[in-house]
A protein has these predicted regions:
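Extended interfacial segments that mediate partner engagement and assembly in macromolecular machines
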Residues: 1-71, 92
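PRPP/pyrophosphate-binding module of the type I phosphoribosyltransferase fold
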Residues: 71, 76-162
Length: 162
């Protein structure tokens, strides 16, 4: 879905409005969208929040979606496969190149979870894709740690007006 109008309201309700009731319906929609991407024994993982942001927000909306999706598609999920090793500033208002620069090296595979992804296909899940910088950093971390393939799935995406 596009991240505008009702799509934006839905994502923000989950992200900042504690509307966890939207997780299951969103997971059903994500499961349909994920079907062409899914492989046997795929590992599903959310995009991580830095621990300080997690304390402030109290939950990771992408982790809630990843868990619900994994149940729906009967695949293993690992909520802490990835970690934010750097506390980055908010990406709001940054240009595309600034977003990629800010996230360079900011995400890595949890050292105690690396064994879960070696030689496996991984599906990374996030709530919104804006520039792709976060998903790119997470994908690179997974591939560098030995993932076979990495696919990405988001609930919404930002599209530029043309």
């Amino acid at each position: 879905m596009l991240y505008r109008d009702n799509g934006r309201k839905l994502v923000l309700a989950l992200k900042h409005g504690d509307r966890h009731d939207v997780v299951r319906p969103a997971a059903l929609w994500l499961a349909r969208a994920a079907q062409p991407l899914l492989t046997r024994n795929m590992l599903i993982a959310p995009i991580p929040l830095h621990w300080l942001r997690m304390l402030k927000r109290r939950f990771n909306q992408s982790a809630l979606l990843a868990k619900a999706l994994a149940i729906e598609v009967k695949q293993e999920q690992c909520p802490d496969l990835l970690i934010r090793t750097v506390r980055t500033r908010s990406l709001d208002g940054l240009r595309r190149d600034e977003r990629f620069e800010t996230l360079d090296g900011a995400i890595s595979v949890h050292p105690k979870r690396r064994h879960k992804l070696v030689g496996r296909d991984v599906l990374l899940l996030d709530d919104v894709m804006t520039s792709g910088a976060t998903l790119s950093a997470a994908t690179q971390a997974c591939l560098s740690a030995g993932a076979k393939n990495v696919c990405i799935l988001t609930l919404a995406r930002v599209a530029k007006d043309t």
